[in-house]
């Protein structure tokens, strides 16, 4: 159920001029072939692991953040509560479409302008398109968020950068010194926690966080639903068009 919907966007990419069409079509055909007889990777029966780490999720009672500027320096929310936040980045490959819907639900609860500078960058153009169709981008615009071109954006720090010496909450993968901005202190957090921090201008307390999350929890099925490309007319039509492009008529070569 996770593989089948993702054949469609590969052909959508072909229809929209992405390179290389033959490579994309080969991948699509390989996925379709696998779907006729799906098999999963399994470890050898006698496999020996270097290390086995067991994490009891029942012991995690509150959100976790990676602190400036080391992704391994992890603390609980209560340990960093109240830290003033200047900028917030919600984006990069660590996010999916549900995270942006959740962030929008947080922003809808804010009266007036945000006390922070908020950056938003969906990971793909497909996410951007669907979020626009759903009206989520209108919510970002009303809140004053800066919407970036889909992709890495602040995560790489080469398309744009936060203000020097600012304190930031980010959903990106790393927070090494000077990566997002010169002298910036960067916390790594979930999209939901990042959105609440943007709304408050600080890292929230647990009660503040739970207040915002209570609204999201009631709509979780709708917010976090997958983007099933094979059920969206525009993507289906583009996929069908791509199948007729001569460059995608791939033949296996012995």
Report each predicted region and the residues it spans.
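Fe-S-dependent hydro-lyases/dehydratases of central metabolism
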Residues: 1-254
């Amino acid at each position: 159920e996770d593989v089948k919907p993702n054949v469609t966007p590969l052909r959508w990419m072909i229809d929209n001029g992405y390179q290389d069409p033959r490579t994309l079509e080969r991948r699509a055909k390989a996925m379709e072939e696998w779907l006729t007889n799906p098999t999963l990777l399994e470890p050898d029966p006698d496999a020996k692991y270097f290390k086995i780490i067991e994490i009891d999720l029942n012991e995690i009672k509150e959100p976790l953040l990676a602190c400036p500027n080391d992704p391994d320096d992890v603390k609980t929310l209560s340990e960093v509560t109240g830290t003033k936040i200047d900028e917030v980045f919600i984006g990069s490959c660590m996010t999916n479409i549900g995270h942006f819907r959740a962030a929008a639900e947080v922003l809808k609860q804010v009266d007036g302008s945000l006390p922070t500078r908020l950056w938003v960058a969906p990971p793909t153009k497909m996410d951007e398109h669907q979020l626009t169709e759903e009206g989520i981008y209108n919510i970002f615009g009303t809140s004053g968020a800066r919407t970036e071109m889909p992709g890495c954006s602040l995560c790489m720090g080469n398309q744009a950068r936060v203000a020097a010496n600012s304190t930031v909450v980010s959903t990106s993968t790393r927070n090494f010194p000077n990566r997002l901005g010169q002298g910036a202190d960067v916390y790594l957090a979930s999209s939901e926690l990042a959105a609440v921090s943007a709304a408050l201008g600080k890292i929230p307390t647990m009660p503040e966080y739970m207040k915002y999350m209570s609204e999201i929890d009631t709509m979780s099925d709708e917010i976090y639903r997958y983007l099933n490309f094979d059920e969206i007319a525009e993507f289906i039509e583009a996929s069908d068009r791509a199948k007729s492009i001569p460059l995608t008529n791939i033949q296996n070569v012995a």
